[in-house]
């Protein structure tokens, strides 16, 4: 997310790569020529300290990356969560697989991502049947530098869907709070189909370490009680060191 093109991560990325969690665990990574590998084993306990118990549940991660050439990389990422009924669980799904393509040229680039997974059931802490079932999603994010290393134009389209009425969810900002038809209950941003379009400009003050981001986003969610649409205008300052 350090070189993110949009003001906020996509809803499906927030779901699969749960924001804010720092699980206790172990990682083993290796690089051989154009290939890189990662294996991870984590406790699902919510305690972020190293002395977290290992009697709650386990999450298993596997990542495989291939650098096709200087501009193009492919990445596959898989996570399986075996937490059971009554056990702590930091991931809100049973398993998820993502496939990602990253292409970076001189002044432009594009990232394409595909996701598929299972929301889980009572064993994973998902007690409501309408929030269980399978989900799938696609996100495409092209960008172009109008001024090299200074002014960036970005676009993102994301689509997600589920077999259940509330199997996918939008980001927390801002459709859940304000949408076109206030008589329709947005259901916490949950539904069975979601489209989102984003267009923005980023002004890089110090590469991606400090940048000003502006954008407009349109969301279309098929919630349990009806269709919900909304437009969000973004102005953000993002920094990392």
Predicted regions and their residues:
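Outer-membrane beta-barrel pore domains
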Residues: 74-241
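Surface-exposed coil loops of outer-membrane beta-barrel proteins
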Residues: 1-66, 75-82, 174-186, 238
